[in-house]
Regions:
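Basic/polar N-terminal segments that are highly enriched at the extreme N-terminus
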Residues: 1-3, 142-143
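Short acidic-aromatic low-complexity motifs
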Residues: 2-35
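Hydrophobic alpha-helical core bundles mediating ligand binding, dimerization, or RNAP-core interactions
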Residues: 12-19, 36, 57, 83-87, ...
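Residues in soluble alpha-helical coiled-coils and helical-bundle/repeat scaffolds
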Residues: 20-23, 41, 112
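A solvent-exposed, acidic/Ser-Thr-rich amphipathic alpha-helical stretch
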Residues: 26-81
């Protein structure tokens, strides 16, 4: 019998490459349903559903986000996982990395008998003001 820790680890190890590959393409977003709860929330209600998150993922069609895990931790008792990630904004046409930054992300998980889903996401971005400014420009994020 697999431990809950190992199940969460396997789930998270599958999640990051799936996000990078499928979440930002309307044709493949549905593949992410296996990772996200329908009532997914981000950062204190900035996103309040899986569908709203999918819409947000499509707002930068010329840029592909690529996530690389640098460190992953799991707290099976609290049903949480956290990751130190390197994220790259990659120009889809040229493959050029337009921006690279670090972020810490905390994931609250819903754990059922047969599946695990991400229920809440909290993102803490690198504090470099130049990178934050470029991020806002690339993704047309209002100040």
């Amino acid at each position: 019998m697999e431990s809950l820790y190992n199940n969460i680890l396997h789930f998270m190890e599958e999640y990051f490459p799936a996000y990078s590959r499928y979440a930002q393409d309307k044709e493949t977003q549905h593949l992410m349903d296996r990772f996200y709860a329908p009532d997914l929330t981000f950062d204190e209600g900035v996103v309040t559903s899986r569908e709203q998150w999918y819409e947000r993922c499509l707002t930068h069609p010329d840029i592909q986000d690529k996530l690389t895990v640098e460190h992953l931790f799991i707290d099976e008792r609290q049903k949480k996982a956290g990751a130190l990630l390197k994220t790259q904004a990659v120009d889809r046409a040229t493959g050029e990395v337009l921006l690279e930054l670090k972020m810490n992300v905390l994931y609250n998980l819903k754990i059922g008998d047969k599946d695990i889903k991400i229920a809440r996401v909290r993102v803490f971005l690198e504090g470099d003001p130049d990178k934050v400014k470029k991020l806002a420009q690339l993704y047309a994020i209002a100040p």
